[in-house]
Amino acid sequence: MSLKGNDKELHLVMFPFFAFGHITPFVQLSNKISSLYPGVKITFLAASASVSRIETMLNPSTNTKVIPLTLPRVDGLPEGVENTADASPATIGLLVVAIDLMQPQIKTLLANLKPDFVIFDFVHWWLPEIASELGIKTIYFSVYMANIVMPSTSKLTGNKPSTVEDIKALQQSYGIPVKTFEAISLMNVFKSFHDWMDKCINGCNLMLIKSCREMEGSRIDDVTKQSTRPVFLIGPVVPEPHSGELDETWANWLNRFPAKSVIYCSFGSETFLTDDQIRELALGLELTGLPFFLVLNFPANVDKSAELKRTLPDGFLERVKDKGIVHSGWVQQRHILAHDSVGCYVFHAGYGSVIEGLVNDCQLVMLPMKVDQFTNSKVIALELKAGVEVNRRDEDGYFGKDDVFEAVESVMMDTENEPAKSIRENHRKLKEFLQNDEIQKKYIADFVENLKAL
């Protein structure tokens, strides 16, 4: 499918939340649009500290530029903290306050840029009013699966859930059972998150969801029927094939092991496990007897080497030195997942990571830690049956080493029998769908053609 030369001049502004879990899908969307429609002009709005990284993520030679934003000073927000990766859990709220104070700056920029559309994130709930005053249309881009959008489009939103049991009942009505500890986590963010999302949906001209009917058919139908605004699907926005080579240190280590034998374990850049979770996870990986590559992250202001020594079980590093790596810091995750020796992915079920796992041949073992990760995991494990979730205690989410071992064992051993056989086949079918370039391009083309017609 080639649409080059078929592009009416169109100018889009991208304004994601200052978190790379949000910035990345906006970049991927930009890259896919510019590949099919090189005449479409795209302008990114980003915090100054993130500009260079975003520029390296964008396709070269595209009609896309990044404009740095100045983040206002807020008491208590450390200087230089301009995205959630640099913020502590205590200062993320202050980062959002600083973003809210950018409204005059954003209005001035939009008045000068005069784009056709602004594609914005849920934290920027105030943007539709600003854009409307300037005669600019707005698109709310949900980087979440449709199951997270549902409470904000549901007719139940007039009576928001206020207890743990309310949350459990609401999610059950969507066909997604959640445990008590998950409902507590969801309830803690429900009011602010869905209040913002409500304002985004009701204020925008149209809503764009990073999902597809092949993965969430009935929920997408419900969202489309209940939404106050037109709903467009962009598909799961599968990342482009990775470029460059895997770091030689990691490549040499992975090359030592047979195909599909290594467990890669990571929880993203913004999830910090507790001491108990680190201990049980490490011991569970050791119990499998398989080689593993464990990535652990700690807050920016701590000594990572000291934290690894403090939190890992006594003698652990010595016991696993021949078949285990424990690392803290950034790694080339997509390169590692694509390596021939990697056969299992133990992770937090962040949506972007789910897609990265599905397009590779590594079996998914999910250990969700917060909000949308809980429901993402249920969709993959219980509905699509393309992975498994680590069993956890209902009241507090505790998991032990045996729970980790049993989850890995269920997909990595005795693969010719159930449940591993069916899980692997379902994974294969999803991978085939996600790697169908024509289907993915059609989502982008349908979206852009609809924008041209508006």
UniProtKB/Swiss-Prot annotation:
What Gene Ontology terms describe what this protein does at the molecular function level?
UDP-glucosyltransferase activity
Residues reported to bind UDP-alpha-D-glucose:
269, 330-331, 348-356, 370-373
Q: Which domain of life is it from?
A: Eukaryota
Q: Which family does it belong to?
A: Belongs to the UDP-glycosyltransferase family.
**Role description:** May glycosylate diterpenes or flavonols in leaves.
Provide the protein name: UDP-glycosyltransferase 79A2
EC number annotated for this UniProt entry: 2.4.1.-
Q: Which organism is it from?
A: Stevia rebaudiana (Stevia)
